[in-house]
Amino acid sequence: MAIRKFRPYTPGTRTRVVTDFSEVTGRKPEKTLVVSKHRKKGRNNRGVITCRHRGGGHKRLYRLVDFRRNKHGVTAKVAAIHYDPHRNARLALLFYSDGEKRYILAPAGVQVGQTVVSGPEVPIENGNAMPLSSVPLGSSVHCVELYAGRGGQMVRTAGASAQVMAKEGDYVALKLPSTEVRLVRRECYATLGEVGNSEVRNTSLGKAGRRRWLGRRPQVRGSVMNPCDHPHGGGEGRAPIGRSGPVTPWGKPALGLKTRKRNKPSNQYVLRKRRKTSKRSRGGRDS
């Protein structure tokens, strides 16, 4: 997989960088593995906006992805690599030996025709799923379960992987992509390798219209709003925000405020907190 750059024929193509989709082999999704999904557009059950800047976009069908990998001991053949409009990662279509078809997150390096399997005693190969107790130290894994049998909940985005650091008792220490080191039960399943399509981090949409196709609406700066709409609003001309630091539309500090509860029960499983992000990496956009 590689990225594709465009010549500046138009303002929209000047900075446009996209993936070349060379790894995608299937043109249409498997009919038995897609369902229609009502798009919430950032609203809750009362119609109130709870997540701003969502709405519109191209119509999609949701692909049913197998995050549990609970067909233990049944081999599956990778029939195709498909595009998924709901995530940056690609999907691998599996044909199991018993006739069942399932989608999984396509690991990096997995090719069409390759065989994958899940279970407690399976070969150490890319795409195979096994308990963390069976994964060798130093190996990279993705789609990691937090609770056994619930399905993979961590490390699922394109290009992501976690590293098995240590094993002690009933727990395995994982170094997550955020650099946080966390303990996970040894019976929880994970898939070997990293998620494919890692080059997506180097892409650029190039124009606002492509962002709208994805269902993302414009973000308006608080400083150009009225005082009734944002704490930064009001004033004559380009007035300063009038505060010691930027705040959210609800008056909370916008940069650097910790949102994790101090006495959260799962804190006992976090051996090392994630690295702190600088203001430059967070971006200084006026919320």
From Swiss-Prot:
Keyword tRNA processing attached: no
Keyword RNA-binding: yes
Top-level taxonomic group: Bacteria
InterPro entries the UniProt entry points to: NA-bd_OB-fold, Rib_uL2_dom2, Ribosomal_uL2, Ribosomal_uL2_bac/org-type, Ribosomal_uL2_C, Ribosomal_uL2_CS, Ribosomal_uL2_dom3, Ribosomal_uL2_RNA-bd_dom
A matching Pfam family: Ribosomal_L2
Gene Ontology CC terms: large ribosomal subunit
GO BP of this protein: translation
Ranges of Basic residues composition bias in the record: 271-287
NCBIfam families to which the protein is assigned, alphabetical: rplB_bact (TIGR01171)
Function per UniProt: One of the primary rRNA binding proteins. Required for association of the 30S and 50S subunits to form the 70S ribosome, for tRNA binding and peptide bond formation. It has been suggested to have peptidyltransferase activity; this is somewhat controversial. Makes several contacts with the 16S rRNA in the 70S ribosome.
PANTHER family to which the protein is assigned, alphabetical: LARGE RIBOSOMAL SUBUNIT PROTEIN UL2M, RIBOSOMAL PROTEIN L2
Similarity annotation: Belongs to the universal ribosomal protein uL2 family.
Protein name, entry field: Large ribosomal subunit protein uL2
Species name: Synechococcus sp. (strain CC9902)
